[in-house]
Protein backbone atom coordinates (compact mmCIF):
# COMPACT_ATOMS: atom_id res chain seq x y z
CA UNK A 1 0.00 0.00 0.00
CA UNK A 2 1.94 3.01 -1.26
CA UNK A 3 1.77 6.48 0.22
CA UNK A 4 -0.09 5.18 3.23
CA UNK A 5 -0.03 5.17 6.96
CA UNK A 6 -2.56 5.42 9.72
CA UNK A 7 -5.18 8.14 9.92
CA UNK A 8 -6.38 8.82 13.45
CA UNK A 9 -9.89 9.80 14.40
CA UNK A 10 -12.55 9.20 17.04
CA UNK A 11 -15.02 6.33 16.78
CA UNK A 12 -15.99 5.24 20.29
CA UNK A 13 -14.93 1.71 21.19
CA UNK A 14 -15.76 0.02 17.90
CA UNK A 15 -14.55 -3.54 17.34
CA UNK A 16 -12.31 -3.67 14.29
CA UNK A 17 -10.31 -6.29 12.43
CA UNK A 18 -6.80 -6.35 11.02
CA UNK A 19 -8.05 -5.71 7.49
CA UNK A 20 -9.96 -2.59 8.36
CA UNK A 21 -10.13 -0.36 11.37
CA UNK A 22 -8.38 -1.06 14.61
CA UNK A 23 -9.17 0.72 17.84
CA UNK A 24 -6.90 1.98 20.58
CA UNK A 25 -9.30 2.96 23.30
CA UNK A 26 -11.57 5.59 21.79
CA UNK A 27 -9.18 6.16 18.88
CA UNK A 28 -9.32 4.16 15.68
CA UNK A 29 -6.57 3.65 13.14
CA UNK A 30 -7.40 2.88 9.54
CA UNK A 31 -5.13 2.53 6.51
CA UNK A 32 -5.38 5.55 4.24
CA UNK A 33 -3.27 8.21 2.59
CA UNK A 34 -0.91 9.79 5.08
CA UNK A 35 1.86 12.07 3.79
CA UNK A 36 5.10 12.70 5.65
CA UNK A 37 3.91 15.96 7.19
CA UNK A 38 0.85 14.18 8.57
CA UNK A 39 3.05 11.47 10.03
CA UNK A 40 5.26 14.04 11.71
CA UNK A 41 2.26 15.88 13.11
CA UNK A 42 1.16 12.63 14.75
CA UNK A 43 4.60 11.74 16.07
CA UNK A 44 5.08 15.15 17.66
CA UNK A 45 2.35 14.14 20.09
CA UNK A 46 2.43 11.58 22.83
CA UNK A 47 1.83 8.03 21.58
CA UNK A 48 1.14 4.83 23.49
CA UNK A 49 2.46 1.28 23.31
CA UNK A 50 -0.35 -0.08 21.13
CA UNK A 51 0.03 2.81 18.71
CA UNK A 52 3.77 2.18 18.56
CA UNK A 53 3.16 -1.43 17.53
CA UNK A 54 0.73 -0.35 14.84
CA UNK A 55 3.11 2.28 13.50
CA UNK A 56 5.92 -0.31 13.49
CA UNK A 57 3.79 -2.75 11.51
CA UNK A 58 2.94 -0.13 8.90
CA UNK A 59 6.54 1.06 8.58
CA UNK A 60 7.79 -2.49 8.10
CA UNK A 61 5.22 -3.82 5.67
CA UNK A 62 3.41 -0.94 3.96
CA UNK A 63 6.09 1.67 3.32
CA UNK A 64 7.95 1.55 0.03
CA UNK A 65 11.64 2.47 0.04
CA UNK A 66 10.98 6.20 -0.36
CA UNK A 67 8.41 6.29 2.42
CA UNK A 68 10.62 4.25 4.71
CA UNK A 69 13.47 6.65 4.03
CA UNK A 70 11.27 9.62 4.91
CA UNK A 71 10.19 7.89 8.10
CA UNK A 72 13.83 7.16 9.00
CA UNK A 73 14.80 10.80 8.44
CA UNK A 74 12.44 11.81 11.24
CA UNK A 75 14.97 10.20 13.58
CA UNK A 76 16.96 13.43 13.10
CA UNK A 77 14.01 15.75 13.68
CA UNK A 78 14.72 18.86 15.74
CA UNK A 79 11.67 18.14 17.89
CA UNK A 80 12.77 15.77 20.64
CA UNK A 81 9.47 13.91 20.85
CA UNK A 82 9.39 13.19 17.11
CA UNK A 83 12.90 11.72 17.15
CA UNK A 84 12.22 9.72 20.31
CA UNK A 85 8.96 8.34 18.93
CA UNK A 86 10.64 7.22 15.70
CA UNK A 87 13.35 5.45 17.70
CA UNK A 88 10.68 3.89 19.92
CA UNK A 89 8.80 2.60 16.87
CA UNK A 90 11.96 1.15 15.32
CA UNK A 91 12.79 -0.59 18.60
CA UNK A 92 9.59 -2.60 18.07
CA UNK A 93 10.58 -3.84 14.60
CA UNK A 94 10.55 -7.57 13.99
CA UNK A 95 12.90 -9.40 11.63
CA UNK A 96 11.42 -7.74 8.53
CA UNK A 97 11.90 -4.27 9.93
CA UNK A 98 15.37 -5.00 11.25
CA UNK A 99 16.40 -6.15 7.79
CA UNK A 100 15.24 -2.81 6.40
CA UNK A 101 17.38 -1.06 8.99
CA UNK A 102 20.51 -3.11 8.34
CA UNK A 103 21.79 -0.84 5.57
CA UNK A 104 21.33 2.12 7.94
CA UNK A 105 23.12 0.58 10.92
CA UNK A 106 26.16 2.84 10.61
CA UNK A 107 23.88 5.88 10.51
CA UNK A 108 22.14 4.73 13.68
CA UNK A 109 25.51 4.21 15.37
CA UNK A 110 26.60 7.70 14.37
CA UNK A 111 23.39 9.18 15.77
CA UNK A 112 23.84 7.24 19.00
CA UNK A 113 27.30 8.77 19.41
CA UNK A 114 26.00 12.24 18.57
CA UNK A 115 22.82 12.56 20.62
CA UNK A 116 22.79 14.00 24.12
CA UNK A 117 19.26 12.68 24.72
CA UNK A 118 19.47 9.72 27.11
CA UNK A 119 16.07 8.32 26.12
CA UNK A 120 16.91 8.41 22.44
CA UNK A 121 20.34 6.90 23.08
CA UNK A 122 18.85 4.01 25.05
CA UNK A 123 16.42 3.24 22.24
CA UNK A 124 19.12 3.49 19.56
CA UNK A 125 21.42 1.14 21.46
CA UNK A 126 18.56 -1.35 21.80
CA UNK A 127 17.97 -1.12 18.04
CA UNK A 128 21.67 -1.63 17.25
CA UNK A 129 21.89 -4.62 19.59
CA UNK A 130 19.28 -6.44 17.51
CA UNK A 131 21.29 -5.94 14.32
CA UNK A 132 23.83 -8.52 13.13
CA UNK A 133 27.52 -7.75 13.63
CA UNK A 134 30.15 -8.88 11.14
CA UNK A 135 33.87 -9.01 11.85
CA UNK A 136 34.79 -6.84 8.89
CA UNK A 137 32.45 -4.01 9.84
CA UNK A 138 33.49 -3.45 13.45
CA UNK A 139 34.13 0.29 13.87
CA UNK A 140 36.60 1.49 16.49
CA UNK A 141 34.77 4.76 17.29
CA UNK A 142 31.54 3.00 18.21
CA UNK A 143 33.35 0.29 20.19
CA UNK A 144 35.23 2.98 22.13
CA UNK A 145 31.92 4.75 22.71
CA UNK A 146 30.45 1.58 24.23
CA UNK A 147 33.49 1.06 26.47
CA UNK A 148 33.25 4.67 27.65
CA UNK A 149 29.58 4.18 28.51
CA UNK A 150 30.39 1.13 30.63
CA UNK A 151 32.83 3.04 32.82
CA UNK A 152 30.95 6.35 32.88
CA UNK A 153 29.31 7.18 36.20
CA UNK A 154 27.07 9.68 34.39
CA UNK A 155 25.30 7.16 32.17
CA UNK A 156 22.00 5.58 33.25
CA UNK A 157 22.01 1.89 34.13
CA UNK A 158 20.10 0.88 30.99
CA UNK A 159 22.66 2.54 28.72
CA UNK A 160 25.56 0.97 30.62
CA UNK A 161 23.94 -2.47 30.39
CA UNK A 162 23.22 -2.17 26.68
CA UNK A 163 26.79 -0.98 26.12
CA UNK A 164 28.11 -4.10 27.87
CA UNK A 165 26.14 -6.34 25.52
CA UNK A 166 27.13 -4.28 22.47
CA UNK A 167 30.79 -4.35 23.45
CA UNK A 168 30.71 -8.13 23.51
CA UNK A 169 29.02 -8.32 20.11
CA UNK A 170 31.93 -6.32 18.67
CA UNK A 171 34.75 -7.87 20.68
CA UNK A 172 33.77 -11.52 20.18
CA UNK A 173 35.79 -11.78 16.96
CA UNK A 174 39.07 -10.66 18.54
CA UNK A 175 40.76 -12.40 21.53
CA UNK A 176 42.66 -9.26 22.52
CA UNK A 177 39.47 -7.20 22.62
CA UNK A 178 37.70 -9.89 24.63
CA UNK A 179 40.52 -9.69 27.14
CA UNK A 180 40.15 -5.91 27.33
CA UNK A 181 36.40 -6.18 27.83
CA UNK A 182 36.85 -8.83 30.51
CA UNK A 183 39.30 -6.59 32.36
CA UNK A 184 36.89 -3.67 32.12
CA UNK A 185 34.06 -5.74 33.58
CA UNK A 186 36.27 -7.12 36.36
CA UNK A 187 37.18 -3.57 37.30
CA UNK A 188 33.68 -3.47 38.81
CA UNK A 189 34.48 -6.31 41.22
CA UNK A 190 33.38 -5.42 44.72
CA UNK A 191 31.34 -2.44 43.58
CA UNK A 192 27.61 -2.21 44.36
CA UNK A 193 25.72 -2.83 41.11
CA UNK A 194 22.04 -2.66 40.26
CA UNK A 195 20.38 -6.02 39.43
CA UNK A 196 20.17 -5.13 35.73
CA UNK A 197 23.80 -4.09 35.48
CA UNK A 198 24.96 -7.08 37.51
CA UNK A 199 22.98 -9.41 35.24
CA UNK A 200 24.49 -7.89 32.09
CA UNK A 201 27.99 -8.16 33.53
CA UNK A 202 27.49 -11.80 34.57
CA UNK A 203 26.04 -12.87 31.23
CA UNK A 204 28.80 -11.21 29.21
CA UNK A 205 31.56 -12.63 31.41
CA UNK A 206 30.04 -16.07 30.83
CA UNK A 207 29.85 -15.34 27.10
CA UNK A 208 33.49 -14.30 27.05
CA UNK A 209 34.52 -17.54 28.77
CA UNK A 210 32.51 -19.62 26.30
CA UNK A 211 33.83 -17.73 23.29
CA UNK A 212 37.41 -18.10 24.51
CA UNK A 213 36.93 -21.87 24.74
CA UNK A 214 35.62 -21.91 21.18
CA UNK A 215 38.63 -19.94 20.00
CA UNK A 216 41.00 -22.23 21.92
CA UNK A 217 39.47 -25.19 20.10
CA UNK A 218 40.07 -23.35 16.82
CA UNK A 219 36.35 -23.00 16.29
CA UNK A 220 34.51 -19.93 15.14
CA UNK A 221 32.84 -18.07 17.99
CA UNK A 222 29.30 -19.37 18.21
CA UNK A 223 28.14 -17.62 21.35
CA UNK A 224 26.03 -14.93 19.77
CA UNK A 225 23.13 -12.81 20.98
CA UNK A 226 20.83 -15.72 21.79
CA UNK A 227 22.90 -16.57 24.87
CA UNK A 228 22.32 -13.06 26.16
CA UNK A 229 18.55 -13.14 25.83
Predicted regions and their residues:
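Generic early N-terminus positional signal peaking at residue ~5-7
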Residues: 5-6, 42
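Short coil/turn motifs at helix boundaries and re-entrant loops, enriched in small/polar
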Residues: 25, 35
Amino acid sequence: MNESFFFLYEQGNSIVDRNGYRSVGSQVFCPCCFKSMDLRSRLIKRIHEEEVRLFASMAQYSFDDREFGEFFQLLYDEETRVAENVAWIMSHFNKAGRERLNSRKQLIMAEAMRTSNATKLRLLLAIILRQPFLEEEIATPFLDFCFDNITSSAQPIAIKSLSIYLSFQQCKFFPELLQELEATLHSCDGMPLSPGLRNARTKVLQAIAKTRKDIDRNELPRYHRQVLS
